[in-house]
Amino acid sequence: MFIGYRCSRNRSCLDATAVITSICRYALPPRFGKHVVLSFPRRVIASGGGNDIAARFVAQRLTEAFGQSAVVDNRAGAGSTIGTDIVAHSAPDGYTLLVVHNAIAINQTLYAKLPYDTVRDFAQVALIGATTNTLVVNPAVPARSVKEFIALAKARPGALNYASTGAGGTAHLATEYFRLETGVNLAHIPYKGTAPGLTDVVAGQVQVMISALPGTMPFINSKRVVALATTGAKRSAFLPDVPTLAEAGVPGYEFDTWYGLHSPLPRRGCRRRCS
């Protein structure tokens, strides 16, 4: 589902090795005075959804590489700012890492004031990978293609609701992009994460959601939702029979979700002491 997973098993191993190598170079702390801090990454903070899956991928590799158990700590909410703030104010000792996605860049333009500085408070450790998103609907929605869904939405303007992971989040922006390109009128219902949004799609409280593939696949496989399209430049190997939105009648549409790894940077005073 991530970049490495779309390739062979050997390529996945290479990608995992690259991530661990980057962690060793950038996440592990420098010499503090006359002492070297030997704290290996053992806490990976995520914000749920696809971030949780990416974090578990990283935690498993960390455990294998360092022989010490690494745990995933999910801190969802407020457009990923809760977990991000925790890491920003964590000790820069190599113990804590943060899985980020598109929201780390989006939030700078969304919030007037953040409790952290996206540029100054973090070291960019590694790119974990990227994944496509999926446009899914409740099975009761009378549409089994994107064209049928667009026709239904235009026939019932404002009557269909879509879920997102919060205002300004990737699911929100991806769906607004879809609305802009197709001219449909959908009502926005923001949720506090992927799972609550998809749960209400299943329950029929909302009819549609565009969400990252890793978090959506269990719902698709269990037939609790119907996948109409993916948002990448090409079809997903995990859903080879599902067309891209560009193929399905929305030319030029492409919207991927990427995942990266950050670590906290020392505050200015600490950086001076470490130099």
Go through each PLM region and give its residues.
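A ligand-binding cleft/hinge motif common to bilobed small-molecule-binding domains
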Residues: 104-113, 172, 177-181, 208-242
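Residues marking helix boundaries in flexible regions
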Residues: 4, 21-24, 151
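Hinge/capping helix and adjacent helix->loop/strand transition within the periplasmic-binding protein
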Residues: 62, 89-94, 109-196, 245-247, ...
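C-terminal lobe and pocket-closing loops
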Residues: 130, 216-274
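Short, compositionally biased segments
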Residues: 6, 30-46, 263-275
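N-terminal (or domain-start) structured segment
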Residues: 14-120, 159-161, 182-210, 219
